[in-house]
């Protein structure tokens, strides 16, 4: 496998053919903000928060899906990028109904963390207040579509890891939302295994456990990469107890 040498923020780095700019950046502790990306799941490139500049073009590229080429010069933290990222977080805030003070993941929310990172203290755009539904029909979990940012982590983890494909996307524009099966109540879904993976990978309070209080729920998202790695390496080995 060939090795590529390219530059990020003035420093030279090596990458294996097929690695993304984001993968190389994270390997070397270079911070590039993300929201839809989650290690272990397929890359989607929807949130656009990981946009980077590449010398020789005025176009911005998502670091999660862009592969470096030999001699490429990448910039990750310019004033232009900071402006774009702040605007993206503002738009996400204005398109949903994000009331942090009463959210179960207040203090543990990736969107909230991004707002701090980009220095967001107010939203310049008019709030749209879309009419979204809350589905509490599942015995263990709730989906509040008001807090959904359409990162589709839930769709991908359910399809790629659990292989149930309960979740999908319906609608257009501001009316776009996550649905269960053929747009039915989550609690009536025959596909759902109640594994909770979708709840764990959700970056906001859109998916949460029943009974969770304000600011109480902390989501563990790192387990996905371990499941995927173990499956790839065929490490699912059960050691039988001695008395069996």
Where are the regions a protein language model picked out?
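N-terminal cofactor/phosphate-binding cores enriched in small/glycine residues
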Residues: 13-70
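Eukaryote-biased recognition of intrinsically disordered, low-complexity regulatory segments
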Residues: 1-11
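Fe-S ferredoxin-like electron-transfer domains
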Residues: 48, 57-191, 200, 205-244
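Short glycine-rich loop/turn motifs that provide flexible caps or phosphate-binding loops at active sites
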Residues: 9, 17, 44, 172, ...
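Short, conserved secondary-structure segments in the cores of folded domains
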Residues: 11, 43, 188-191
């Amino acid at each position: 496998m060939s090795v590529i040498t390219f530059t990020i923020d003035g420093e030279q780095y090596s990458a294996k053919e097929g690695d993304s700019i984001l993968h190389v950046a994270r390997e070397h502790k270079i911070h590039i903000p993300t929201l839809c990306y989650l290690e272990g799941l397929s890359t989607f490139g929807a949130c656009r928060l990981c946009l980077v500049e590449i010398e020789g073009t005025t176009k911005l590229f998502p670091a999660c899906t862009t592969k470096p080429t030999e001699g490429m010069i990448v910039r990750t933290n310019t004033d232009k990028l900071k402006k774009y990222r702040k605007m993206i977080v503002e738009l996400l805030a204005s398109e949903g109904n994000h009331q942090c003070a009463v959210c179960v993941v207040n203090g543990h929310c990736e969107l909230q963390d991004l707002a701090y990172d980009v220095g967001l203290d107010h939203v310049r755009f008019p709030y749209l207040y879309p009419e979204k539904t809350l589905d509490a029909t599942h015995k263990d979990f709730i989906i509040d579509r008001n807090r959904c940012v359409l990162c589709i982590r839930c769709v991908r983890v359910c399809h790629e890891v659990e292989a149930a494909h309960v979740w999908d996307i319906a609608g257009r524009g501001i009316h776009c939302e996550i649905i269960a099966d053929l747009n039915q109540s989550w609690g009536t879904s025959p596909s759902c295994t109640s594994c909770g993976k979708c709840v764990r990978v959700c970056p906001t309070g859109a998916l949460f456990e029943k009974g969770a209080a304000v600011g109480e729920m902390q989501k563990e998202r790192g387990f996905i990469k371990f499941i995927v790695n173990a499956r790839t390496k065929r490490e699912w080995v059960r050691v039988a107890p001695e008395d069996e």
